[in-house]
Amino acid sequence: MSAKTLYDKLWDSHVVREEEDGTALIYIDRQLLHEVTSPQAFEGLRLANRKPWRIDANLATPDHNVPTTAFNSVEDIVDPISRIQVQTLDANTKQFGITEFGIGDVRQGIVHVVGPEEGVTLPGMTLVCGDSHTATHGALGALAHGVGTSEVEHVLATQCLIQKKMKNMLVKVDGKLQPGVSPKDVVLAIIGQIGTAGGNGHAIEFGGQVFRDMSIEGRMTVCNMAIEAGARVGLVAVDEKTVEYVKGRPFAPKAEDWDAAVAAWQDLKSDDNAHFDKVVEMDGSKIEPQVSWGTSPEMVSDVNGKVPNPAHESDDVKAGGIRRALEYMGLEADMAITDIPVDYVFIGSCTNSRIEDFREAAAVLKGRKVASSVEQALVVPGSGLVKRQAEEEGLDKIFIEAGFEWRNPGCSMCLAMNADRLPSGKHCASTSNRNFEGRQGAGGRTHLVSPQMAAAAAVAGHFVDVRDMMKEAS
């Protein structure tokens, strides 16, 4: 039998039927639902007089439109569209008998945080959600990707999808990361090297010592941004860290089922001689803290670097892109990254709103204050359970004493779909995943960074190398 990649194994184990043209009917083990991309899917079921094929294979939670300030019920949501979408999710899940972690449930939160922490996401599964950052769940060795609303309906009705197999890509990062360099820096550095189209048509497996050493939450950060590298799927092989992370979670297998599951998961890794269509290798020890300066995640630099000069770019198309980005971002060519001012700070999103992210940011902020020039600094937990754990550890007090606002769970300022928005012309140090024009608010200027780098920028009022602050504290 020929050697297989992890992606090959996950794909092959879920093929129901394969056609001569290469398309295949794939079985989907789990679907996660939220309020934005599910209403039309449920309406499609009603119009066709269908019921979900497997009710227990679906889990819903509102996240995109949920206010992060204190409120008592769905009816208190001020924006009428947001309120209707959340109310509609409540009504649809109730009608079709689907489990929902709704407003007021401590388990409510960002769908890509909730799935793994509840054990809903398991190694070896196929998992979809009507959200492009579903690749996050690949950190647990699951074949996970985003789908459109019509496909959400297909999965509800049939538990299957028609797919074409992707190519295999390996991003191998060896060596040891420097202190102060985080998983977010790793994935931004990868995107900076291969570009936002580097993974087009591929499922990316992240391998090498850096990812073996990385925590599961760190792997989630990396897989979360596989889509920003052009790939729908990001994967990390299952190891003992994966098994320990899943063990004991509410939806994880129990007793004999657990033993059988762990035995089945042992092969969820690429075979030694497996073929990858594309291989990228990097030295993790050379990765520096990253800051995006432009309007695409590939427009990124080391914190001690400079904004590029389009005059030095031989490719006219790239030069034009740099000029447009500099104009939108209000930056000058050759400007030092550390000279870029920071008006707002956002620590949160499905990329960086887990407990480890908050511990790292709080370690930077402890005993320090947010600069007076920073107009607003937000910390938004990825779920009610993350919020509760952070408060039990006293992290909320560190953030509040530093001058941050400690909020309730939700997608928040990652995207301009709720009350948390970045004003026009303002620069934001953000731990989210996208920085295109208007992503956080019309005219807003987003700089993608790690939680530590966001915390350091909040204190300084501009971008700084967090490693310098770490040295001061030691």
Swiss-Prot record:
One of its GO terms (biological process) is L-leucine biosynthetic process. InterPro entries: 3-IsopropMal_deHydase_lsu, Acnase/IPM_dHydase_lsu_aba_1/3, Acoase/IPM_deHydtase_lsu_aba, Aconitase_4Fe-4S_BS, Aconitase_4Fe-4S_dom, IPM_dehydratase_rel_enz, IPMI_cat. It comes from the Bacteria. Binds 1 [4Fe-4S] cluster per subunit. Its cofactor is [4Fe-4S] cluster. GO terms for molecular function: 3-isopropylmalate dehydratase activity; 4 iron, 4 sulfur cluster binding; metal ion binding. Pathway: Amino-acid biosynthesis; L-leucine biosynthesis; L-leucine from 3-methyl-2-oxobutanoate: step 2/4. It catalyses: (2R,3S)-3-isopropylmalate = (2S)-2-isopropylmalate. It is an enzyme of class 4 (lyase). CDD domains: IPMI. Keywords: 4Fe-4S, Amino-acid biosynthesis, Branched-chain amino acid biosynthesis, Iron, Iron-sulfur, Leucine biosynthesis, Lyase, Metal-binding. [4Fe-4S] cluster binds at C350, C411, C414. It holds the Pfam family Aconitase. HAMAP family: LeuC_type1. Heterodimer of LeuC and LeuD. Catalyzes the isomerization between 2-isopropylmalate and 3-isopropylmalate, via the formation of 2-isopropylmaleate. Belongs to the aconitase/IPM isomerase family. LeuC type 1 subfamily. This is 3-isopropylmalate dehydratase large subunit. It comes from Hydrogenovibrio crunogenus (strain DSM 25203 / XCL-2).
